[in-house]
């Protein structure tokens, strides 16, 4: 929703302040295939294995798993 940086779900989420829906200090992300312990995963980390096809990889600058353009 507008103004939210993360999903205000559980107060136990270590990355997101449930009261403000903002990322906690030092957190880059709160969820996503390329988010691990509140940080973006390193560029080149496989986020979606495709078996016989080309895998999808984290880009190091977002929590989402970008689709490989070669699919």
Curated annotation (Swiss-Prot):
Chief place of localization: secreted
Record SUPFAM superfamilies: Blood coagulation inhibitor (disintegrin) (SSF57552)
Signal sequence, start to end: none
Disulfide bonds: 6-21, 8-16, 15-38, 29-35, 34-58, 47-65
InterPro entries linked to this entry: Disintegrin_CS (IPR018358), Disintegrin_dom (IPR001762), Disintegrin_dom_sf (IPR036436)
Expression across tissues: Expressed by the venom gland.
Residue ranges of every copy of the Disintegrin domain listed in the record: 1-71
MF GO annotations: toxin activity
SMART domains in the cross-refs: DISIN
Keyword flag Disulfide bond: yes
Alphabetic keyword roster: Cell adhesion impairing toxin, Disulfide bond, Hemostasis impairing toxin, Platelet aggregation inhibiting toxin, Secreted, Toxin
Lineage top rank: taxon: Eukaryota
Motif Cell attachment site, chain ranges: 50-52
Function: Inhibits fibrinogen interaction with platelets. Acts by binding to alpha-IIb/beta-3 (ITGA2B/ITGB3) on the platelet surface and inhibits aggregation induced by ADP, thrombin, platelet-activating factor and collagen.
Other observations noted: The disintegrin belongs to the medium disintegrin subfamily.
Family: Belongs to the venom metalloproteinase (M12B) family. P-II subfamily. P-IIa sub-subfamily.
Subunit text: Monomer (disintegrin).
The name this protein goes by in its record: Disintegrin applaggin
Organism: Agkistrodon piscivorus piscivorus
């Amino acid at each position: 929703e507008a103004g939210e940086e993360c999903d205000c779900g559980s107060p136990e989420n270590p990355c997101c302040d449930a009261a403000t829906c903002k990322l906690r200090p030092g957190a880059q992300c709160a969820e996503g295939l390329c988010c691990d312990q509140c940080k973006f995963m390193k560029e080149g980390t496989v986020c979606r294995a495709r078996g016989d096809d080309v895998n999808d990889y984290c880009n190091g600058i977002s929590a989402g798993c970008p689709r490989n353009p070669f699919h």
